[in-house]
A protein has these predicted regions:
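Bacterial Sec-dependent N-terminal signal peptides
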Residues: 15-35, 563
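Beta-strand-rich extracellular modules
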Residues: 183-185
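Bacterial N-terminal signal peptides
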Residues: 7-16
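Inter-heme linker and motif-flanking segments adjacent to c-type heme-binding CXXCH motifs
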Residues: 187-192, 213-245, 262-563
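Conserved hydrophobic/aromatic pocket- or pore-lining residues that grip, position, or stack substrates
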Residues: 180, 258, 289
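Bacterial N-terminal signal peptides that target proteins for export
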Residues: 1-6
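Short S/T/G/P-enriched beta-strand
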Residues: 27-66, 72-99, 188-248, 256-257, ...
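Conserved small-residue
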Residues: 39-148, 154, 159, 165-166, ...
Length: 563
């Protein structure tokens, strides 16, 4: 079934993107200054991109990997500078990971290009994405792998790299690497960073919709007998949809043509008249299926509880997945999806949001808007070791006694995010984590990693952090951006002091008379907290402290009162 309703939006945005990233590639000398070097910070915006394994029956999501990037000029004197498109360009190229897996082309790896026109109204060459980005080996020229400049976010952006989770040797790799390089006007490479482009086809329907399964019980109606189980399941979905909704769907079907999804509204025009008459894609998937997860876990991890195994998690029945496990990284061992997002009914907007629950306040009291009214860092990271807002019905605390274990209050069926705007860990007002910036104008994701993949994550995720600062984990080394040691004080990210030997020599002077500025991270008893852990193993003043060591006064010497 042809779905041209999105064609105009895709075409308009595609033409705008083809206008280039601005900049024309002027040399970056003005931004770098004397003695400058460069760093490229880049990350996938979501931490995972789901893509249909086949587009022959219906499509939920196309190949569309988004990467944000910033270029920092390091200076031997003075602060570093974040460069714009008038000073530098950013391009990407394929690079092998430590196992030798490389993904440079999408040609021959999917039937997407066969169905792009009837599904998305886009006439594309093989290897070309919906907004004009290309896979490196498929691109007809450098423009196809050059990032544009996103003026609204003030960074470089690659919208919609059409990558699939199959490498050039035909092997499955859902976490392939791509090299993002800053180049000057002559095309000379100034700096590069290797970044994961996470992508997974593990968005399967067959667990429930394959013939004979719970949603396609034998004898109920004439189900598909396609030998390909995923194709069979998808055909059964259309059969069931026709029976329930009175439709007569003809493949290929773009689900979002009726069920609005902001992820596919690239022009940002909002739902069409046709879409307004139907539930959003999130509602018809999450809320509708919420009571059909018998035997699966659709609840947050309780204090002291363990994270359910991947095959038992409700979200992983459709999101990638029991094998992919796209929720990975620093929080994975303590929480599951529901600790942040709430259960499936909440995600689908079955209950109205509480006051302050919507991203901009305009949607309070209404069903949550997919892709916008989402959990925030400040919801769990609401305070520090000495200050945390009083929250009625506050969720339980994590074992560290500082962070909330859930992002919403107890008993809230809407899972409205807790607001703690004064927290040192809060996003910018009215912005999601993935759209916020912090210290020095860097994107939050540039230093902490992608949403759902906060460093440390899997080995390929950790490559970027290791290249930028010498070890995995969040960017915590001042030297990642500062050639000259930053000045003493608490002007670092989230009010941090400088890291390294220079601070060891200077911290006593700072502590004397300013103990209250130490306690938010080192604790009221100055014995250290989770907020004062070592980012890496280092030797300071002759004492070696392992990564993860909680540092307080007593780690190295007596406390502030001589005890």
């Amino acid at each position: 079934m042809a779905r041209s309703i999105l064609a105009a939006a895709f075409t308009a945005v595609s033409l705008a993107a083809c206008g280039g990233g601005g900049g024309g590639g002027a040399t970056p000398a003005g931004g770098g200054g004397s003695g400058s070097a460069f760093k490229v910070f880049a990350n996938n915006d979501l931490g995972m991109h789901c893509v249909d394994e086949s587009f022959a029956v219906f499509s939920i999501l196309p190949p569309y990997n988004v990467v944000d990037a910033q270029v920092v000029a390091l200076r031997s004197s003075g602060p570093p500078a974040v460069l714009d498109a008038s000073q530098v360009q950013v391009r990407y190229s394929a690079v092998a990971d430590a196992t030798g897996s490389i993904n440079s082309t999408s040609v021959g790896k999917s039937d997407f290009w066969q169905y792009a026109l009837p599904l998305y109204g886009a006439s594309l060459a093989a290897g070309q994405g919906l907004q004009g980005m290309w896979m490196p080996a498929d691109a007809p020229g450098a423009a196809g792998t050059t990032l544009g400049w996103d003026a609204s976010m003030g960074l470089f952006k690659a919208p919609g790299i059409p990558i699939f989770p199959v490498d050039d040797a035909g092997h499955l790799n859902r976490y392939p690497l791509m090299r993002f390089s800053a180049v000057d006007g002559s095309g000379a490479v100034l700096a590069s960073t290797d970044v994961v482009l996470p992508v997974s086809e593990e968005t399967s329907c067959q667990s429930c919709h394959a013939t004979g399964k719970a949603a396609a019980p034998t004898g109920a109606m004439a189900w598909s007998s396609d030998p390909d189980l995923e194709a069979q399941a998808r055909k059964n979905v259309l059969i069931l949809h026709d029976a329930r909704a009175g439709t007569a769907l003809q493949a290929p079907v773009l689900c979002a043509s009726c069920h609005y999804s902001p992820a596919l509204d690239l022009a940002g025009t909002g739902p069409s008249a046709q879409q307004q008459g139907h539930g959003t894609m999130s509602a018809v998937m999450h809320a509708f299926h919420a009571d059909k997860m018998a035997g699966l876990v659709d609840a947050p991890v309780a204090p002291g509880g363990g994270v359910p195994s991947a095959p038992l998690q409700a979200c992983y029945q459709c999101h990638p997945g029991a094998t992919t496990q796209c929720l990975r990284g620093a929080m994975t061992t303590k929480v599951d999806c529901q600790n942040c997002h709430g259960g499936m009914a909440a995600v689908g907007g079955a209950a109205p949001l509480r006051a302050g629950g919507s991203m901009d306040g305009s949607n309070d009291g209404k069903p949550r808007r997919p892709w916008l009214d989402l959990p925030r860092c400040q919801s769990c990271h609401a305070g520090d070791a000495v200050a945390r807002p009083t929250v009625a019905g506050a969720p339980p605390l994590a074992a560290d006694g500082i962070r909330f274990l859930n992002a919403y209050v107890n008993g809230d069926a809407s899972a409205s995010p807790i607001l703690a705007a004064s927290s040192r860990f809060a996003e910018q007002p009215g912005k999601l984590y993935r759209k916020s910036k912090g210290h020095g104008g860097l994107a939050c994701e540039a230093c902490h990693g992608s949403t759902h993949a906060i460093w440390s994550a899997n080995p390929n995720d950790d490559v970027a952090a290791t290249q930028l600062q010498g070890h995995a984990g969040v960017i915590g080394e001042c030297s990642a951006c500062h050639q000259a040691p930053p000045s003493e004080g608490l002007g670092g990210p989230h009010g941090m002091h400088p890291v390294g030997a220079a601070w060891v020599e200077a911290h006593q002077d700072r502590a004397e008379g300013h103990l209250s500025s130490c306690s938010p991270c080192h604790g009221a008893d100055f014995r250290g907290t989770v907020l004062s852990r070592m980012f890496s193993t280092r030797t300071l003043a002759g004492r070696t402290l392992a990564a993860g060591t909680v540092v307080g006064c007593y780690t190295c010497h007596d406390g502030p009162n001589g005890d």
